[in-house]
Amino acid sequence: MLFRSKTSGFKLAVDFDVYRDFADMERLAPYMDFFMISGSEELLPKFRELSCKYDCLFNISLAERGSVTYFKGQEFRVQAVKVDTVIDTTGCGDSYHAGFVCSYMLENDIEKAMRVGSEIAAETLKHYGGF
């Protein structure tokens, strides 16, 4: 199924979370539409490089530092939405990714999708447990 994703018309989003086998990730990149990972600034050069090679949105969540998305070598950055009182971070990244993917699928606007993801993640931070 993975290897038919680009030709079958459905979109594939994968959250690699903290997985760091870059050779394996690159092997899968041609079949994905949304490549998402949680990480740090040091990952950015690798994902910019991958975005120049594969037709996929590469999104790196940097927690309170916001997020970065690469598409065809172009970089997009959005700051995290400030939250006065953080109750629980459980599910925050998942909420961000859901908002990002849904917004992009509806609007086809990378920066807007990143802002929507950040807003939904900020709301999740205000509640106990995955929200």
Residue ranges and their predicted role:
Residues 6-77:
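Conserved phosphate/ATP/ADP-binding segment of small-molecule kinases
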Residues 47-131:
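Conserved phosphate-binding/catalytic region of the ribokinase-like
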